[in-house]
Each structure stands twice: as structure tokens, then as C-alpha cells.
Amino acid sequence: MKLRWFAFLMVLLAGCSSKKDYQNPPWNPEVPVKRAMQWMPISEKAGKAWGVSPRLITAIIAVESGGNPTLVSKSNAVGLMQLKASTAGREVYRYMGWKGQPSTSELKNPERNISMGTAYLSILEHGVLKGIDDPEVMQYALVVSYVNGAGALLRTFSSDRKEAIEEINGMDKNEFVDHVAKNHPAPQAPRYIWKVQKAMDAM
């Protein structure tokens, strides 16, 4: 009986430990940031064209692909900024007035990938997230929306977009991150914010 109780206790502790590690496991941004920095000239060009910080673009590249332009994920996210052709890619195409969606080969092209990823960030900022006043909160909202969708983020505040933006504007960046950690349906969302910020700090 004691042996069974000890085994149960060890499993319980292991579960608690793994949950804690998942929330904030070690991640060294040095190598992925160094690899992502090689694409900075393209990021600067795209950032200037779309009004997006090149440092944010580079940080997303570091976190998403580690600077590998040919990376394809299990969910078919492609390239440096890990764009899905059927979602972000299609949205950028629609915004530009083009038909269809980008091909895999197009998304593996560093310049095209960064251009479309940056365009998508701009579309989010000046579209569904428009109205967020604090620049730091906006940046965090962009990061979460980029990886998990803007709709999922806004619904954690309200089903009404205007009310959601108003609630966000009542928060500072720390309160926003805390809200995301407690309410976002994707458990990786707060960690993604942390990793992008860590990558930016490493530049």
C-alpha cells in the first residue's frame, strides 16, 4: 500500500513539475537570433514598406524558424516566418487583390516570405487590432494574433470587437500578458510572447 501511494505521489509531482517547466522552460535565443539576423536587410526593407519594426520581424523569424528559410512544420507552416498558405498567405493575397494563395516554393523564398509575414502583421495592426493605444500592448497583441489568430485573442475579452479593444486599452503590458496567460485557449500563447521579447532583447 505504501509503495502504491509513493508511486502515485511521484507521478503527481512529476505532473506538477512538467507543467511548471512547460510554462517557462529554458530557451536560449542566441543562436536563433544570430541566424535570423542574417535576414535583417530584407526585414528592414519589408518593415519600412509596411510600417512594422524590423526587430519584431527578426524576433519572430528567430522564434518561428530559427532563421531556416526552407523549414516546413507538421501543420504546413512554411519558411522564415512560418506562414500557412491557406490562412495568412491567402489573407495577404486577398489584401493585395491577388487570387488564390502562395505556393510552398514562394513561401520558401526569404524575401517573399518576410514580405508576406510583415504584410500580415500590418494587416492585423491596422485591421482587427486597430484601436489599441499602448504601443507595447499592441506589439504583444500582434505577437499573439500572429501565431494563434486575432479572433481567439479578442474573444478572451469580449465577443464584441469594440468592447474587447476597450478592455485591452484599460491594461498595461503586464496586465495584458497576465490576462493572456489565464484566459487564452492556446497554452503556448504567453510563452510565445516571452520568447519573442527574449529574442528582441538579445539583439
Curated annotation (Swiss-Prot):
One of its GO terms (molecular function) is lytic endotransglycosylase activity. A lipid is attached at residue 16 (S-diacylglycerol cysteine). A lipid is attached at residue 16 (N-palmitoyl cysteine). It holds the Pfam family SLT. Keywords: Cell outer membrane, Cell wall biogenesis/degradation, Lipoprotein, Lyase, Membrane, Palmitate, Signal. It is found in: Cell outer membrane. GO terms for biological process: cell wall macromolecule catabolic process; cell wall organization; peptidoglycan metabolic process. Residues 1-15 form the signal peptide. Its main location: membrane. It comes from the Bacteria. It catalyses: Endolytic cleavage of the (1->4)-beta-glycosidic linkage between N-acetylmuramic acid (MurNAc) and N-acetylglucosamine (GlcNAc) residues in peptidoglycan with concomitant formation of a 1,6-anhydrobond in the MurNAc residue. Its EC number is 4.2.2.n2. It is a lipid-anchor. GO terms for cellular component: cell outer membrane. Murein-degrading enzyme. May play a role in recycling of muropeptides during cell elongation and/or cell division. Preferentially cleaves at a distance of more than two disaccharide units from the ends of the glycan chain. PANTHER family: ENDO-TYPE MEMBRANE-BOUND LYTIC MUREIN TRANSGLYCOSYLASE A, SOLUBLE LYTIC MUREIN TRANSGLYCOSYLASE-RELATED. Belongs to the transglycosylase Slt family. NCBIfam families: PRK15470.1 (NF012014). This is Endo-type membrane-bound lytic murein transglycosylase A. It comes from Enterobacter sp. (strain 638). The gene is emtA.
